[in-house]
Regions:
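Beta-lactam-recognizing serine transpeptidase/beta-lactamase-like catalytic domain environment
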Residues: 2-7, 75, 221-230, 271-321, ...
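Periplasmic/cell-envelope proteins involved in peptidoglycan metabolism and beta-lactam response
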Residues: 1-293, 316, 393-403, 521-522, ...
Length: 598
């Protein structure tokens, strides 16, 4: 009986054990979880709690200042007040934005668009700038209502002030927000995704130097996002100061000379490469980009006069008669003609087998002309003749030595111009090169295009003894001087350069020179006029008809340098649709040289 009782007891115990076992397992599991949470996960939860309590904020540095060659400030900084929000501390977004809309007097739907867009781009407990550059009224009303605006701060930030505004816009450029593409190209911009960076001009070209490095501030926050204490700060590093070669007083005065007309000017020292003035007209005021008004900025980009387009480095124009000295030089170098050899100019040039004449600008022609007279009076027929005897295979490579058809790398958005040859025409036009193309090229027309900067560099090489200089617009960065670079052009006979320079003096000082109107014995200037065709016209009647459309009128060009005895500056001016290089562009160049020499 006892044995049977024992088996019954064991059976009962087994059943009790099997019944309680799952509860025991659950109890052990719960104990281990508590142990894990209290011991092993304690540090993790402490970190999470800290992350909810401690906020890491970027501290943006002031951008470096920009000075002119005389240490006058061109671009400095001013402090603005921005409204920054941390959405995690806001319980009701709609209620928050309604109140904020009333305080800052901005429509709620406008605030919502910015708020929800920024919200979608950030991680939890990150902040973003909702409103920039609050005015005094907005600032006062927000501060008075801080208690009703959880997660809200007013942060000081920096904006740019371009002191001379519109006249220096083509040089300084402007700031804006980096796009995803910008950040992809330059990952360093990622830290500045909520701040403006350089998007054009010097601000873009030297953004890495001007921008500085971001710092960080670690703050303890209360439940509403208010700052309880600043725990630590990793300081930011200020951007580097840049000194330009630009003379801002000269820049201002020359910009006014254009009087709103479309055009460009480059003033460069032929022996140093320093650019003393760079004008693109019309221009824009870079300070306009501080107001953050998207629609108004959009209208600026759509302006038909293209104020954001830097004509001095990106505008491509037929060099017209300003190319003739180089055609003359290659003809001398190739022994196609001598300096004193004369050609009869009767106003027309005929090619065998072609019934259409190539006409000169002066009816009846210039009579018998040697190279000096041909350049002084700008004889087209003379240069038709020597271009005909040359080939594009000799002209194009020679012009390339003087910088035509290639970028000088002054700015990223600089144009290369067009230096056409047989290969170019076949590739671009699907046509063979004709002798007529070479003839047109001989007077700087046809397919050839150049920027004002390229023309300035080519003339600098003419007068400095055959050195193609690299232009410099930055003189120093944080006190460290930029390097001067030049490339020697191979000239067979240096006397040929002297012949060309004598001719350029005659352009101004000869009684029949095309720029005799700017002759001044007190400051002797040499140079070359040019009239760049916008539309090719074959007869005078058609020309007068075309002139009625201002946009189809010829461009006025002049390249000048001085003083003749010891040239220190080369100036190129182009006035779009200005028609007369001697009457419109030459006086601007003369003014520039006079101002530079004062």
């Amino acid at each position: 009986m006892k044995g049977k009782q024992f088996l019954t007891d064991q059976s009962i115990l087994r059943r009790i054990f099997l019944f309680l076992f799952p509860f025991l397992i659950l109890l052990i599991f719960a104990f281990l979880q508590i142990l894990n949470l209290m011991v092993f996960q304690a540090e993790k939860f402490k970190t999470q709690a800290d992350s909810n309590r401690i906020l890491k904020e970027k501290v943006f540095p002031p951008r470096g200042l920009i000075f002119d060659t005389n240490d006058e400030i061109i671009v400095d900084n001013f402090i603005r007040q921005d409204l920054v929000v941390t959405p995690n501390f806001i319980e009701d977004y709609s209620l928050y934005l309604s109140l904020l809309s009333e305080l800052v007097e901005i429509e709620k739907n406008t605030l919502e668009q910015v708020f929800y867009k920024k919200l979608s781009e950030i991680k939890p407990f990150q902040s973003f700038t909702l409103l920039r550059d609050l005015n005094d009224r907005q600032l006062a009303k927000v501060k008075l209502n801080f208690k009703d605006l959880p997660g809200t701060e007013i942060n000081s930030s920096f904006s740019r002030n371009v002191v001379h505004g519109e006249s220096s816009g083509a040089v300084t450029g402007y700031l804006g927000f980096a796009s995803k593409q910008d950040i992809l190209i330059n990952p360093n911009l990622k830290n500045f995704n909520d701040q403006q960076v350089g998007l054009l001009g010097i601000e873009k070209e030297f953004d890495d130097e001007l921008r500085g490095t971001v710092g960080y501030r670690y703050s303890e926050k209360d439940a509403r996002g208010g700052v309880l204490d600043v725990l630590s700060v990793e300081p930011s590093t200020k951007g580097k100061n840049i000194k330009l070669s630009i003379d801002i007083e000269l820049q201002d005065k020359l910009y006014k000379e254009f009087r709103g007309r479309k055009g460009a000017l480059i003033a460069i020292e032929p022996d140093t490469g320093f650019i003393r003035a760079m004008i693109s007209s019309p221009s824009y005021n870079p300070n306009f980009f501080n107001n953050f008004k998207t629609e108004e900025i959009k209208l600026l980009f759509q302006n038909k006069n293209s104020p954001l387009f830097n004509r001095a480095i990106s505008g491509q124009y037929p060099p017209a008669s300003t190319l003739k000295p180089f055609i003359g030089l290659v003809a001398l170098e190739e022994d196609v003609i001598t300096w004193q050899e004369k050609i009869l100019d009767e106003g027309e040039f005929f090619v065998e087998g072609d019934k259409r004449p190539y006409t000169g600008w002066k009816e009846g022609g210039h009579g018998e002309v040697n190279m000096e007279k041909a350049l002084a009076e700008s004889s087209d027929v003379y240069f038709y003749n020597i271009a005909y005897d040359l080939t594009v295979n000799s002209i194009a490579p020679f012009l390339k030595k003087f910088g035509f058809g290639k970028s000088s790398d002054l700015f990223i958005n600089e144009s290369q111009g067009i230096l056409p040859d047989k290969k170019w025409k076949l590739g671009q036009k699907g046509e063979f090169w004709f002798k007529g193309d070479t003839i047109n090229m001989g007077i700087g027309q046809g397919y050839i295009l150049a920027t004002p900067l390229q023309i300035a560099l080519a003339y600098s090489a003419l007068i400095n003894g055959g050195k193609l200089i690299s232009p410099r617009i930055v003189q120093s960065i944080e006190g460290e001087e930029t390097k001067f670079v030049s490339e020697k052009i191979e000239i067979k006979d240096i006397q040929n350069l002297e012949y060309i320079k004598e001719s350029l003096i005659s352009v101004v000082e000869s009684n029949t020179g095309t720029a005799k109107n700017i002759f001044d014995p007190k400051l002797r200037i040499a140079g070359k006029t040019g009239t760049a065709q916008v539309k090719s016209i074959l007869d005078d009647n058609k020309y007068q008809e075309i002139r009625e459309n201002v946009l189809l009128r010829d461009h006025a060009l002049f390249v000048g340098y001085g003083p003749v005895e010891d040239p220190s500056i080369v100036v190129v001016a182009i006035v779009e649709n200005g028609e007369s290089g001697s009457l419109v562009a030459a006086p601007i160049v003369q003014k520039a040289i006079n101002l530079y020499e004062q």
